[in-house]
A protein has these predicted regions:
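N-terminal secretory signal peptides that target proteins for export/translocation
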Residues: 1-11
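Subtilisin-like serine protease catalytic core
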Residues: 72-87, 92-367, 444-447, 469-473, ...
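Extracellular S/T/G-rich loop segment that most often corresponds to the catalytic His/Ser-adjacent loop
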Residues: 300-304, 413, 434-514, 518, ...
Length: 578
């Protein structure tokens, strides 16, 4: 499966020829749910209509391993006790004008719009619908962030460059090792992206000849990847690799087939697609990977301290000639809150919800400062759930973020994070933000859930091949493969990623609190984990080269989100507290 996110926050490309593009439950049990694990049963391929709503279905009723949302709505006849639950979505910018999000966006009623005054005295001027922590001094927005490992090399180089571990004081060893890892990663990524960019330039140069030549063999230009692949044997083409052809600037039939296969591998069917990706890769190389580039100069803050009020209030900014970055948040928010009653597009998890968009995620890695301040803003302004569909492999100021986690816990706020799309075991590989240190078992806080991605197929491919996993560091799985949701520019589309699995859980938590407001954050977390559906099947381990394990071994709960069972358990727990 190909997962392409053009903002380069998460890139998972099987680019084939071009080379390269989210135990026990750690808190006291609230109640026991005894459900027999579901065994694998072959199901028919879903229709295009069913694929748009598969994740809301129930396995027992529909033979589709969704989250049983439709089942709950069909049987529920009660009205929620809370009129509106606020869910903060810490992410990119958002399409505030999307038809399916009208009436679903949080409004700060204590603030008077556009008067240039901080009416509610929260430190943020004119924060009507949220805040952009990556908004610039000029009223614009940052499009390209540096990667965190670039920042580490930049900031810690004076301390550690050219030194051995024996020369480092023990109190700085952790930082030193992270610095060494960052240096290595920067070297690897520079090579990786420059090689990819070189390949794209080659593909662009030969593209007209590729189209003309293949039209001779396929007059209707209806060729598939596999048809092109079969031409190697049919026409006895030499066995040179793509890299060899590229470096030799070959333009024979083999080279032309190679280039088009590479384009089809990532669904780049037009020259415009390839040129757009070239522009983005050029920015990755010259901005995100550039030791000199500093996006914080555009914002005007001090990145070494925590402070209130930097950025701007425009969470849905569009500037002519500047790449927009609204798609990711719009997709995530639609899953949670798309209007269920307007007969348009899709139906979100719940109707009585308000999305609080908080921008921290341009292309590149999020800053720990922005993560921290966004969490605190969300808590201080009434959010009950915070969705964080982002992640990175380094963290300069993890202590800031963990303090924000605890601040949220003290205020009874749930944090939901996507596990990431690198096909990695995050029990053994660094992934931030997190609530359990690498190699540890104990949670730092009780209000944090990490979500992996599942598919609509209850077979060995049930776990999405891109999804990160971990018996200790991933709590639960939820549908994330081929999810049809809202998209930027008032549109809809299907996409995949753990980024789309996390809001399934965020929406469920909001739904629970809307009916059972007396529950604590630890109870809501426990309810969600305990009530999930267990599937007694063996699945392919993501990135495991064909290795299979029990599905239950890939997360702490060993389960998939089940809204119906979560609401039933929440009802029982809530009733006992009255």
């Amino acid at each position: 499966m190909l997962v392409v996110e053009y903002d380069f926050k998460t890139i998972k490309l099987n680019y084939c020829l071009v080379l390269l593009f989210f135990i026990l439950i750690g808190c006291k049990s609230t109640n026991e749910v005894t459900t027999s694990p579901v065994k694998s049963v072959p199901i028919e391929e879903l229709s295009s209509v069913d694929m748009k709503t598969w994740y809301q279905k129930d396995y027992q009723q529909d033979s589709i391993p969704g989250i049983s949302l439709d089942k709950w709505y069909k049987q529920n006849n009660k009205k929620p006790k809370n009129k509106k639950i606020i869910v903060a979505v810490i992410d990119t910018q958002i399409d505030l004008k999307h038809e399916d999000l009208q009436g679903q966006i949080w409004t700060n009623l204590e603030e008077i719009a556009n008067n240039g005054i901080d009416d509610d005295h929260n430190g943020y001027i004119d924060d009507i619908n949220g805040w952009s922590f990556t908004g610039t001094k000029s009223g614009g927005y940052v499009v390209w962030n540096s990667f965190e490992y670039v920042r580490i090399v930049n900031n810690w180089g004076s301390l550690f460059k050219d030194k051995t571990e024996f020369q480092i004081d023990t109190q700085y060893l952790h930082k030193y090792r992270q610095y060494q890892r960052a240096v290595k990663r920067l070297e690897e990524r520079n090579k990786y992206y420059r090689n990819w960019l070189k390949s794209l330039k080659y593909n662009i140069a030969v593209y007209p000849k590729v189209k003309d030549t293949l039209k001779y063999f396929f007059p209707k230009e209806d060729y598939t990847y596999h048809q092109l692949d079969s031409m190697y044997n049919k026409y006895k083409i030499n066995s040179k690799t793509y890299k060899q052809r590229r470096d030799d600037n070959d333009q024979d039939l083999g080279a032309l087939i190679d280039c088009m296969m590479a384009n089809l591998e990532v669904n780049h069917k037009t020259l415009e697609n390839i040129k757009d990706l070239e522009v983005q890769l050029d920015s990755v190389v010259n901005k995100s990977l550039n030791l000199i580039y500093n996006e914080r100069l555009l914002i005007g803050d001090n990145p070494t301290i925590l402070e209130i009020g930097y950025g701007n209030n425009n969470v849905s900014n569009t500037i002519k000639g500047v790449r927009t970055i609204q798609d990711h948040n719009t997709m995530v928010s639609g899953i949670i809150a798309a209007n269920r009653t307007n007969e348009k597009g899709i139906k979100g998890i719940l109707q009585n919800v308000k999305i609080m968009p908080l921008n921290i995620s341009p292309s590149g890695d999020e800053h720990d400062k922005d993560i921290t301040m966004a969490i605190r803003y969300a808590v201080d302004n009434g959010a009950k759930v915070i969705n964080m569909s982002f992640g990175k492999e380094f963290s300069m100021h993890e202590d800031w973020v963990l303090e924000a986690f605890k601040y949220a816990e003290e205020h009874n706020v749930l944090l939901v994070r996507s596990a990431g799309n690198e096909s990695l075991n995050v029990d053994k590989n660094e992934s931030f933000p997190r609530d359990i240190p690498l190699g540890g078992l104990k949670e730092i806080c009780g209000n944090f859930i990490t979500i992996g991605s599942s598919t609509h197929k209850l077979d060995s491919t049930f776990v999405s091949d891109y999804s990160n996993y971990g018996k200790n560091n991933v709590d639960l799985f939820a549908p994330g493969g081929k999810i049809y949701t809202t998209s930027a520019s008032n549109s809809y589309k299907s996409d995949s990623g753990t980024s789309l699995a996390a809001p399934m859980v965020s929406g469920t938590a909001a739904l629970i609190w809307s009916y059972y407001p007396n529950l604590t954050v630890t109870e809501v977390k426990q309810i969600i984990l305990e009530s999930g559906t267990a599937y007694d099947i063996e699945v392919l381990v993501p990135g495991g080269e064909g290795k299979k394990v029990k599905f239950s071994e890939l997360s702490k709960s060993g389960k998939v989100l089940n809204v119906y069972d979560a609401m039933e358990l929440a009802k029982k727990v809530s009733k006992k507290k009255r």
